[in-house]
Amino acid sequence: MKNYYSVLNECAVKNQVLFAGSTFAHDFPINELMQDFDVDARVYNRSEKGAKLADARDFVMEQAEALEPSKIFLCFGDEDIKAEGFLAGEFSYEYKELVSDIKKKFPDCQI
């Protein structure tokens, strides 16, 4: 996964919101919705087009370590489900493992 976010993360405000996912999340109009609903938080979209959950674990953890968010929204699965040989049980297990890893490293973070 790309790491061009590292420069942006140096300027980011800690204790805000991390939004991480794949194509759907990458294209999601977060800023527009924040304005429409007067959200008083900074949301950092660190999503990658084409990302699959299995490839994203290290990337998500890296972004969380850099941003130290108070909340994390995960939005993976849109690319996984299209992949040949997709197994729902395996995907569910990997998702739970990612959430568990985040909770261990960032116990005060809401997911």
Positions of PLM-derived features:
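Hydrophobic positions in alpha-helices of CheY-like receiver
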Residues: 98-102
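Conserved SGNH/GDSL esterase-like catalytic core that processes O-acyl groups on lipids
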Residues: 1-96
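Active-site segments of SGNH/GDSL-like serine hydrolases
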Residues: 75-81, 103-111
